[in-house]
Amino acid sequence: MNLNATILGQAISFVLFVWFCMKYIWPPIILAIETRQKEIKESLTNAKKARDELYILEKKIHQNIIDAKQKASNILNSANKQKVSILEDARNQALEESKKIILNTQSEINIAITHARKNLHKEVVDLSISMAEKIIKKNISKDDNQELLDELVTSLSQVKN
């Protein structure tokens, strides 16, 4: 066989092989490559969207945490103010109660003092009458009468004080 015929046969075989590959093998490979490229692009796009959404969610969560801390702080401040108010009210009530008790006790003491003074005055009057009876019954001298009267006046002045 001739070298030219061999080269020509190989060239024709090569062209037929290339045509066959381009017609039947190349399109599915290109289609698979393009499909894979689309999937990769979609995956990258989805990953970017997910990253952006994650960033937005992180911001929202961070803001929610800040808001929750602020609300907790407000609640604590409100509770502290309410505690102070309740304690102040309780202290004021206790002071008012103690004042009422003191006033009641003082009025009871004043009543007891007045009652004691009345009883003392009654006893002094009874004593005076008793002394006067003794003076009248004894009919003693003027000096003795004067001495008894002085004692009576002294005892009366001590009782009044």
From Swiss-Prot:
Highest taxon above the source species: Bacteria
Major subcellular site: membrane
UniProt keyword Transmembrane helix, yes or no: yes
Protein's UniProt keywords contain Transmembrane: yes
Gene3D superfamilies in alphabetical order: F1F0 ATP synthase subunit B, membrane domain
Record Pfam families: ATP-synt_B (PF00430)
Alphabetized UniProt keyword annotations: ATP synthesis, Cell membrane, CF(0), Hydrogen ion transport, Ion transport, Membrane, Transmembrane, Transmembrane helix, Transport
Transmembrane segments: 11-31
UniProt xrefs under CDD domains: ATP-synt_Fo_b
InterPro entries according to UniProt: ATP_synth_B-like_membr_sf (IPR028987), ATP_synth_b/b'su_bac/chlpt (IPR002146), ATP_synth_F0_bsu_bac (IPR005864), ATP_synthase_B_chain (IPR050059)
Subcellular location: Cell membrane
Membrane-protein topology: Single-pass membrane protein
GO molecular function: proton-transporting ATP synthase activity, rotational mechanism; proton-transporting ATPase activity, rotational mechanism
Entry's Gene Ontology cellular component terms: plasma membrane; proton-transporting ATP synthase complex
Family: Belongs to the ATPase B chain family.
NCBIfam families: ATP_synt_b (TIGR01144), PRK05759.1-2 (NF004411)
Function of the molecule: F(1)F(0) ATP synthase produces ATP from ADP in the presence of a proton or sodium gradient. F-type ATPases consist of two structural domains, F(1) containing the extramembraneous catalytic core and F(0) containing the membrane proton channel, linked together by a central stalk and a peripheral stalk. During catalysis, ATP synthesis in the catalytic domain of F(1) is coupled via a rotary mechanism of the central stalk subunits to proton translocation.
Quaternary context: F-type ATPases have 2 components, F(1) - the catalytic core - and F(0) - the membrane proton channel. F(1) has five subunits: alpha(3), beta(3), gamma(1), delta(1), epsilon(1). F(0) has three main subunits: a(1), b(2) and c(10-14). The alpha and beta chains form an alternating ring which encloses part of the gamma chain. F(1) is attached to F(0) by a central stalk formed by the gamma and epsilon chains, while a peripheral stalk is formed by the delta and b chains.
Protein's UniProt name: ATP synthase subunit b
Native source species: Buchnera aphidicola subsp. Acyrthosiphon pisum (strain APS) (Acyrthosiphon pisum symbiotic bacterium)
Gene assigned in the entry: atpF
